[in-house]
């Protein structure tokens, strides 16, 4: 899962002792095999409710997604269980986003996953962090065709478009996609990419003047600059 491991390193330190989150994660994972829906939901809901969401996001939700993905990869849980956990994590992030005020001013940011990419937890996390900082966010989610992305950017004229790449593409597919982004999206918006795949394809992105974000700390720095620029134009 893209950016998830890096997110923990770049996130603010949580106020709870790390062992508390580690113990909770072990308890949550223990409910997945054998699968116990009631205990899983009670523990997850209870934990997220009692800490600030930023701490819950980086101390519980992102590590949980990362570890569940690894369990599925190692054939310790079924893909249906992995999807179940992922949907709960998505719901938590969407719920937190919906409690934030709708920005009428500030930098405009489009967040999406490229064509064929269905894993959107990291992209959703990016959208949340943009919302927290007062950006006007257009979150498009998974598997967005380049033509559709370009069409939207042409209409809303964003200050920045961020794409989430969890995995590197083959050389041919990467070249085709990056050229399409440069030709169709870049004329309407500055482009940035993040994730393990983006970092692996760094040279190709740099060749086409597309910014590669190393982690969430670098994202936050870029967003702060955008918001200052937006304020100065107001």
Predicted regions and their residues:
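Long amphipathic alpha-helical segments
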Residues: 1-101
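C-terminal regulatory/effector modules of DNA-binding transcriptional regulators
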Residues: 75-234
């Amino acid at each position: 899962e893209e950016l998830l491991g890096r997110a923990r390193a770049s996130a603010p330190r949580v106020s709870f002792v790390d062992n508390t989150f580690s113990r909770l994660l072990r308890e949550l994972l223990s409910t997945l095999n054998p699968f116990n829906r009631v205990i899983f939901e009670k523990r997850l809901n209870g934990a997220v409710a009692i800490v600030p969401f930023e701490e819950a996001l980086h101390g519980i939700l992102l590590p949980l997604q990362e570890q569940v993905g690894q369990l599925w990869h190692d054939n310790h849980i079924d893909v249906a269980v992995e999807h179940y956990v992922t949907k709960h994590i998505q719901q938590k992030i969407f719920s937190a986003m919906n409690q934030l005020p709708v920005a009428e001013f500030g930098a405009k940011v489009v967040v999406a996953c490229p064509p064929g990419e269905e894993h959107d937890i990291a992209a959703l996390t990016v959208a949340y962090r943009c919302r927290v900082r007062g950006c006007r966010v257009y979150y498009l989610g998974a598997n967005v065709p380049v033509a559709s992305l370009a069409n939207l950017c042409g209409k809303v004229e964003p200050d920045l478009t961020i794409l989430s790449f969890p995995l590197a593409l083959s050389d041919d597919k990467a070249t085709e996609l990056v050229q399409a982004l440069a030709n169709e999206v870049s004329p309407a918006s500055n482009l940035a990419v993040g994730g393990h795949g983006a970092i692996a394809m760094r040279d190709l992105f740099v060749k086409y003047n597309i910014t590669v974000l190393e982690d969430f700390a670098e994202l936050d720095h870029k967003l702060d600059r955008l918001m200052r620029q937006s304020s100065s134009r107001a």
